[in-house]
UniProtKB/Swiss-Prot annotation:
<feature type="repeat" description="Solcar 2">
    <location>
        <begin position="136"/>
        <end position="220"/>
    </location>
</feature>
<feature type="transmembrane region" description="Helical; Name=4">
    <location>
        <begin position="191"/>
        <end position="211"/>
    </location>
</feature>
<dbReference type="GO" id="GO:0015234">
    <property type="term" value="F:thiamine transmembrane transporter activity"/>
</dbReference>
<feature type="repeat" description="Solcar 3">
    <location>
        <begin position="233"/>
        <end position="318"/>
    </location>
</feature>
<dbReference type="GO" id="GO:0030974">
    <property type="term" value="P:thiamine pyrophosphate transmembrane transport"/>
</dbReference>
<feature type="repeat" description="Solcar 1">
    <location>
        <begin position="13"/>
        <end position="115"/>
    </location>
</feature>
<dbReference type="GO" id="GO:0015297">
    <property type="term" value="F:antiporter activity"/>
</dbReference>
<dbReference type="GO" id="GO:0005743">
    <property type="term" value="C:mitochondrial inner membrane"/>
</dbReference>
<dbReference type="InterPro" id="IPR023395">
    <property type="entry name" value="Mt_carrier_dom_sf"/>
</dbReference>
<keyword id="KW-0050">Antiport</keyword>
<dbReference type="GO" id="GO:0005739">
    <property type="term" value="C:mitochondrion"/>
</dbReference>
<feature type="transmembrane region" description="Helical; Name=3">
    <location>
        <begin position="142"/>
        <end position="162"/>
    </location>
</feature>
<keyword id="KW-0812">Transmembrane</keyword>
<keyword id="KW-0496">Mitochondrion</keyword>
<feature type="transmembrane region" description="Helical; Name=5">
    <location>
        <begin position="239"/>
        <end position="259"/>
    </location>
</feature>
<feature type="transmembrane region" description="Helical; Name=6">
    <location>
        <begin position="293"/>
        <end position="313"/>
    </location>
</feature>
<keyword id="KW-1133">Transmembrane helix</keyword>
Length: 323
């Protein structure tokens, strides 16, 4: 006979709460940041054409021939040419992506940190306003964030591929059509994981940095605000810390995001990360090519992290209080 301890029950409950809170957070966050995501993808995927002239320093010169320029220009052009609903293009697959990703990410992160640092688990289970300020070590949060990023990326990646291809298609299309088109290419079902190496190169450090920055900023913020309002569940603190952690970590890995998006819509067999890096550098303007869509990408990442952390922390607190 197996005896279930109250500790085991609490652990199970906590995992389900984190999955539910993560799913809710992912769904709501995605809906809000969808327009910025569409703008970012359009900017990242457009090919920059430069003339082949060069000056005495062997630098490429000439005017860039591009369709989209900046957030406002791209957003207004997409609305004008494709309608305002196109800012939520591919939203079904994107919602599946974000719900799956956020649920796995938050629950995995908290489980790993809880194993490596039992004190953190005790702290997370407390919902009272008087709980003490606590931060796990940066090495532990880096491991937890990176591990959560790996697992959530692998599980949700096919939805990311489908979403990117839908957004890249200027004509009307849907989830089913796009799925069939992707697997009909050379490579079949493996195309649903095209560019995953670049994605993991991006996501491992990004999530490691993001959770580490978030825990650090939150600890500092709570240290100075909890003495004033006696509340380290302050949503404004969570939003601000999430905004900073998301924007900084995204900037650090932006080149890998550009390469990942290019590989996701690529139809050439044998065209990998190395070839993509080389083409971007030599054919599309050097180093700056790796920061295409950088502004909307960083703004979106900051806003997404701010909303995601806030929605997760607040919904988790509500769910735990209801038990």
């Amino acid at each position: 006979m197996i005896i279930t301890t109250s500790n085991d029950e609490d652990k199970k409950t906590n995992v389900f709460v984190e999955l539910a809170a993560g799913s809710f957070s992912g769904a709501l966050t995605r809906f809000i940041v969808a327009p910025l995501d569409v703008v970012k993808i359009r900017l990242q995927l457009q090919r920059t054409q430069l003339n082949n002239n060069s000056n005495n320093n062997n630098k490429i010169i000439g005017k860039e021939n591009v369709n989209y320029r900046g957030i406002i220009n791209t957003m207004s052009k997409v609305i004008r040419e494709e309608g305002i609903r196109s800012l939520w293009k591919g939203n079904f697959s994107a919602e599946l992506l974000w719900v799956t990703y956020a649920a796995i990410q938050f629950s995995t992160y908290n489980e790993i940190i809880g194993i490596l640092d039992p004190e953190y688990r005790k702290h997370q289970q407390r919902t009272d306003k008087d709980k003490p300020n606590y931060k796990p070590s940066s090495s532990i949060t880096m491991i937890g964030g990176a591990s959560a990023g790996i697992l959530s990326t692998i599980v949700s990646y096919p939805f990311d591929i489908i979403r990117t291809n839908i957004v890249n298609n200027h004509n009307k299309t849907n989830f089913k059509q796009t799925f069939k088109t992707i697997i009909a290419r050379n490579g079949g079902y493996s195309n649903l994981f095209s560019g995953i190496n670049s994605s993991l190169f991006q996501i491992v450090p990004q999530m490691g940095f993001q959770f580490t920055f978030y825990e650090t900023f939150k600890f500092i913020s709570n240290k100075y605000t909890s003495s004033v309002n006696n509340n380290n569940n302050n949503p404004l603190n969570q939003f601000t810390c999430g905004l900073l952690s998301g924007a900084i970590s995204k900037f650090l890995v932006l080149p890998f995001d550009v390469v990942k998006k290019r590989l996701q819509v690529n139809e050439k067999v044998g065209y990998g990360m190395k070839s993509c890096f080389r083409d971007l550098y030599f054919n599309e303007g050097g180093v700056k090519a790796f920061f295409k869509g950088g502004t909307p990408g960083i703004v979106k990442a900051g806003l997404a992290a701010a909303l995601s952390f806030t929605f997760f922390e607040q919904s988790k607190r509500i769910l735990l209080n209801k038990q």
